[in-house]
Design a protein with these regions (language model features):
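A contiguous loop/helix-start segment that scaffolds small-molecule binding in enzyme catalytic cores
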Residues: 4, 170-245
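Short internal beta-strands
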Residues: 30-37, 129-131, 202-205
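Class I S-adenosyl-L-methionine
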Residues: 1-14, 19-125, 189, 211-215, ...
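Short beta->alpha connector loops
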Residues: 11-14, 160-162, 182-184
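Residue-level detector of structured alpha->beta connecting loops
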Residues: 29, 93, 144, 173-174
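Conserved beta-strand termini and adjacent loop/short-helix elements that scaffold enzyme active sites
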Residues: 61-63, 130-132, 159, 204-206
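Class I SAM-dependent methyltransferase SAM-binding "motif I" and its flanking Rossmann-like core
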Residues: 103-171, 236-240
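Small/polar loops that bind or transfer phosphate-bearing groups
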Residues: 8-9, 99-102, 131, 158, ...
Length: 245
């Protein structure tokens, strides 16, 4: 049986990886890594994988990672990527392939689409998942921000879903983490200011990577966009110890 394992390799720091992930990367027949189409530079997941796998076991798979809309270019990239992985299995029947993804493979990851399309092409494929540490967890740890306590709820929100839904999430959940804002950072900060939540928020960009930036959201320039790899945690308002129980 062909086996495809989606492995989370964490947000950036090569030590933020499970032992299981490290062991798999060290022994897999091949490690596929997603890279942006046409970008010759080292991919984000690839940079971490290089700490655990020799370069000759790494195969780059191109995706339309920077496309903002879901269109034909993205569809073609998924099909081409799945064809590449399926062709590898055709040449290595019964082998195990790892697909490395930043953070966790079940959180906004290209792995979801890839695995479904490869299974469609091959008919039979054992798909497994190894969880990874997310940027949200790294930022919470680095800033000493307990995400949730007692009966508090937590929402993970993609800013690409729009400012109105962000506002709604802030009303309905105790803690809200925002992903995928980058150029939408001024919009996210405006909502936080309007809802009185700016002082509850911390910001982290390029966590564990060169150029990392971690600061209270109220210290950010309200008009300047952030990089794609940026995360905001809006922490719950809390009373004293155990107040959320
Ligand atoms: C397509 S999602 C991938 C999420 C990833 N699978 C995870 O579990 O964290 C990309 C978003 O994750 C967040 N992110 C991932 N790595 C990050 C990092 N090193 N620093 C800050 N944010 C990061 C950003 O919000 C970015 O827009």
């Amino acid at each position: 049986m062909n086996t495809l394992v989606g492995v989370g390799v964490g947000p950036g720091d090569p030590e933020l990886l499970t032992v299981k992930a490290a062991n798999l990367l060290a022994k897999a027949d091949v490690v596929f890594v997603p890279v942006a189409a046409g970008d010759p530079g080292t991919g984000r997941a690839e940079a971490t994988v290089l700490h655990y796998a020799e370069a000759w076991r790494i195969e780059r798979v191109e995706f339309a990672l920077h496309d903002r809309v879901h269109g034909p270019a993205r569809e073609r990239a998924w099909d081409a990527a799945a064809t590449q992985v399926a062709a590898w299995f055709a040449a290595h029947p019964g082998a195990t392939a790892v697909f490395a993804t930043i953070g966790d493979p079940c959180v906004y990851s290209t792995f979801t689409y890839l695995a479904a399309t490869v299974r469609g092409l091959l008919g039979d494929l054992d798909v497994q998942l190894v969880p990874g540490i997310t940027a949200m967890q790294d930022l919470a740890a680095r800033t000493g921000t307990p995400l949730v306590e007692g009966r508090e709820s937590l929402a993970l929100f993609p800013m690409t879903a729009g400012a109105e839904r962000f506002r709604d999430a802030l009303e309905r959940f105790d803690a809200v983490v925002a992903y995928k804002f980058g150029r939408l950072l001024p919009e996210a900060l405006a909502v936080l200011r309007e809802t009185g939540r700016l002082d509850d928020a911390v910001y982290g960009a390029a966590l564990g990577l060169p150029g990392e930036e971690i600061r209270p959201a109220c210290d950010l320039d309200p008009d300047v966009a952030g990089p794609y790899l940026s995360t905001l945690i809006v922490a719950p308002r809390r009373g004293g110890r155990g107040s959320a129980l």
